[in-house]
């Protein structure tokens, strides 16, 4: 299992401090990663897609 911790401080009102911990559970034979997010504070003013953005950025760094 691989854990990746990232922090982002955005100056905008809609994206306060976000701490993400991504745990890579395993990689399937097709190359798709399965993961889970932990330690993500509620973001009532943020669109849900923001988490997908961070996941894609982090996973593409491999």
From Swiss-Prot:
Protein name in the entry: Regulator of rDNA transcription protein 15
Parts forming coiled coils: none
Family according to the record: Belongs to the ART2/RRT15 family.
Keyword entries, A-Z: Transcription, Transcription regulation
Name of encoding gene: RRT15
Protein's job: Involved in modulation of rDNA transcription.
PANTHER family the UniProt entry points to: PROTEIN TAR1, REGULATOR OF RDNA TRANSCRIPTION PROTEIN 15
